């Protein structure tokens, strides 16, 4: 589900399920989009009240808070490589608490990389630098198992993935 809010009125709308074509006279259009796995109403609630610049500052501050948990000293290239890698480890799994259409328990995390790989890399790192998030991720996996009878090796879009051969932790 999605909710689109535009600062410019549009006079026509066409579409067939997977796309929409909006016709507007303005050269610049500011659009806010809220998405939800649950409902249109939830998508409306997920549209931020902040403007673009304020939302950008909010996101930068949130990422700075996470990335600053580890301080390194190196040259510019080394720092860029390290913090880019750290950023990538923090992207997934995604906290989708309140967005699970199948059961209401929280926390709910989705979009897992293959766990057989991450249990020996990013999971220990998260245990050290963000233990509350790691606890919530593990509880979310346990809830997935309780409700679906299968511990996912990978998961995306509320669906378990059976992507890797072998066994994980």
What are these regions (language model features)?
Residues 1-111, 143, 147-151:
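Acidic/polar, glycine-enriched structural segments that form the non-catalytic walls/loops
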Residues 114-118, 122-169:
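Aromatic-rich carbohydrate-recognition surfaces in CAZymes
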């Amino acid at each position: 589900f999605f909710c689109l809010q535009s600062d410019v009125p549009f006079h026509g709308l066409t579409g067939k399920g997977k796309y929409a074509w909006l016709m507007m006279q303005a050269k610049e259009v500011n659009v806010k989009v809220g998405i939800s796995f649950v409902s249109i109403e939830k998508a409306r609630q997920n549209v931020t009240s902040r403007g673009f610049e304020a939302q950008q500052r909010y996101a930068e501050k949130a990422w700075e808070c996470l990335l600053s948990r580890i301080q390194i000293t190196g040259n510019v290239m080394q720092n860029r490589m390290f913090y880019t890698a750290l950023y990538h480890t923090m992207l997934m799994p995604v906290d989708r608490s309140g967005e699970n259409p199948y059961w209401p328990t929280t926390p709910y995390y989705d979009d897992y990389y293959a766990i057989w790989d991450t249990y020996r890399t990013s999971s220990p790192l998260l245990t050290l630098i963000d233990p509350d998030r790691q606890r919530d991720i593990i509880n979310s996996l346990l809830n997935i198992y309780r409700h679906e009878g299968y511990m996912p090796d990978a998961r995306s879009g509320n669906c378990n993935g059976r992507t890797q051969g072998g066994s994980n932790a």
